[in-house]
Amino acid sequence: MKGSKFEDLSTDHSSVMTRDMNNAKRSFFALFVLMCAGLAANAQAFEGIIEFTKTTGPVVTNYKYYVKGDHVRIEEISARGDAQGIMLVDTRDKTVTALSPDRKLYMDVPNMRLPKDVKTDVKKTGEMRDMAGYKCEKWVVKSSEEDRTITYWVAADKFDFFIPLLETLNRKDEQAVFFLEVQDANGVFPMLGVEQKLDGAEVSKLQVTKVVKGVQKPTLFEIPAGYNKFERN
């Protein structure tokens, strides 16, 4: 029925359907782009294991960081090569849980300490050196009041977990405190940190020995089954 009201209604209905389909396609495409962008951002962030040593005087301690998103598992490695102390850190919720593998206990670690306020002079030298498979830049942080100079050799590889980790742990040692004084340090990790007095005497050294990228199991960052909570009396 050409020119009839039925034909007009049919044409209008088809136009509405076409417009709705186009809008739906645009909405789906926009959602797809956002999802891809989010996945790409997450894919770029470092996930894997970082092994390093801490030297203080004659004492050398081995550690491992297991990193996955907002979660970091810190293991202190014994001379036998197994984990003798473990901390589970959630940098989003700002919580720290300590695990005792020997005693099958876990404990919430409160952090009531105020951040340490120090006056420092920071110099990003631009000097480069290869370390642990990375090209690292030399940063020097100095404080006359604290009688300390710390030289960091930092690598940039989307180590986005590190600054939130330091803020969550809120440690008072100079290696951590001084690093937080550096502006625009997001995404880097110190492959070597040497703490010295102003007269040159070495106080401590943190040195990365191995970096392995790879997907980490979510269970690494959970309290294991069978662990009991340690209650303070």
Kindly label every feature range from the protein language model.
Residues 4-7, 18-29:
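Bacterial N-terminal signal peptides that target proteins for export
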Residues 39-43:
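Sec/Tat signal peptide C-region and signal peptidase I cleavage site
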